[in-house]
UniProtKB/Swiss-Prot annotation:
Any one GO molecular-function label of the UniProt entry: proton-transporting ATPase activity, rotational mechanism
GO-annotated cellular components: vacuolar proton-transporting V-type ATPase, V1 domain
Organism: Caenorhabditis briggsae
Name of this protein: V-type proton ATPase subunit C
Source organism phylogeny: Eukaryota, Metazoa, Ecdysozoa, Nematoda, Chromadorea
Pfam assignment, any one: V-ATPase_C
Additional notes on this entry: Vha-11 and vha-3 are transcribed on a dicistronic transcript where vha-3 is the upstream transcript and vha-11 the downstream.
Name of the gene: vha-11
Amino acid sequence: MSSAATSGEYWLISVPGEKGANDAWDKLNRATGNISTNSKYLIPDLKVGTLDQLVGLSDDLSKLDTSAEGVIRKLVQYFTEVLEEDKSKIAENLVIGNKDMKTYVTKFQWEGAKYPLKQSLKVLSEIIGKQITQIDNDLKMKSLAYNNLKNALASMDRKTTGSLLTKDLADLVKAEDFVLNSEYLQTIIVVVPKILVKEWETKYATLSSMVVPGSSKLLTEEGEHALYTVTLFKKVIDEFKNIARENKFIVRDFVYDEETLKAGRTERDKLLAEKQKQYAPLIRWLKINFGEIFSAYIHIKALRVFVESVLRYGLPVNFQAAVIEPAKGQSKKLRQELQKLYIHLDGSAAGPIDTLEDSPALMSLGVNEYYPYVFFKLNIDFSNK
């Protein structure tokens, strides 16, 4: 079936094996091949252990599954944030080695180097659990460090935006706008509403005594305000501020100091350089660790299918696992076909059990919906819940 007509949702199922190696697979394909795309889910022979161990492990794996998906979602969300203007490139970065998610799932191969088959199911689940915890912790640390840089930069940039009443004045003033190094005189900055500009120019020199006549100079106009300088004696500044405020002229708390302004610009340049320095390694880390945790996630699914299959179908281990992608709009029909095909596996099942309150055994296994065959849903769209 054409992949273009698939739904993007995956069903991981297993059914009992039959006498011939491919009999169960052929039977599944004959019944569903025109309404789904099917791939073998190649789960190797794993160490079974005891029934009690399997029951306990089923619950542990359910929790591990939820944990892994949660960390993947956090990582993908953060990856998208870090890409900023390149958000559209998120999909091409969500790869496992050189495989996209769909290819990795539909052509799954157990990674024995990471998860040795000689280990028990319990040990394998612990290996994966530690891996998830490590990636989660590393993600928190790396995102904290990078976010601190971003927030510091954003805080500095916010000061350069907004109105003349609040924004940083460093880029709006020059040394020649001020009387500097005077024992008695000081130049101050005043924000004047545009509708009061004529009034300011007429009366600023008379707002208090000791204002230098002709000293007011327009620096810039933005939005509803104009920015002026005025020079006066230091000892009347407080008086001037109060009278100016009564006339709706706002004196900014600003003293021109070249070293302070230079230090501010240098600090921003340093922060920006550090952010750019951290960007590429962070992108690389996110890409690699997405691959690591997604791989771990699909191995958890494989463990769950294996454990549930042994609990359902018993020993010796003989089941056929499959990755099924329903065709668009065919999920209901596919479910019906699977029900007809495997109803004999559960004589009491006239249909799926949607409410499990009367089945504590199934609830204890973390099963939320029940079918005559082993079933887990897989969603690889991590952009939203």
